[in-house]
A protein has these predicted regions:
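General beta-strand structural signal in soluble alpha/beta enzymes
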Residues: 74, 114-117
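Flexible N-terminal pre-Rossmann segment of NAD(P)-dependent oxidoreductases
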Residues: 3-4, 60-70
């Protein structure tokens, strides 16, 4: 079953009807990210932590939030405590933030699962005359 083009609403229905578990959904998300590795669009994979969180969500059977158990990829400019955040910059290539950005905190407190951070490419800064 491919989840690649499913909406959050469709995934939520699948979770509610127990067609798929959060752990299976998170695993499928990591498989898709691995399949797209050649595109070089993901900076940091959060596989172990995200699989563990999905197992906890499955055990707790939390469906109070629409995002509960839904895997998300976040842009590589939002800090997540303990997850390498580079902003696609060489100077930040090994930066592990000691805090989590408010936006990420709100998503995670709603039950979403951060699976990967994807590239943040800036526009060229060369001046065009």
């Amino acid at each position: 079953m491919s989840i690649q083009f499913k909406t959050i609403r469709e995934l939520r229905e699948m979770l509610d009807k127990k067609v798929i578990s959060s752990e299976e959904l998170t695993g499928e998300t990591h498989k898709l990210a691995e399949d797209l590795k050649d595109l070089n669009c993901f900076v940091t994979m959060n596989k172990d932590v995200s699989i563990e969180k999905s197992k906890l969500i499955d055990q707790a059977d939390k469906s109070a939030s629409v995002l509960s158990g839904i895997p998300l990829a976040q842009k590589d400019l939002f800090c997540t405590e303990g997850l390498r955040t580079t902003c696609s910059s060489k100077i930040l290539s090994n930066f592990i933030p000691p805090y989590t950005a408010t936006a990420v905190m709100k998503l995670e407190s709603a039950g979403s699962i951060t699976t990967v951070s994807y590239t943040h490419l800036t526009l060229p800064t060369k001046r065009i005359v």
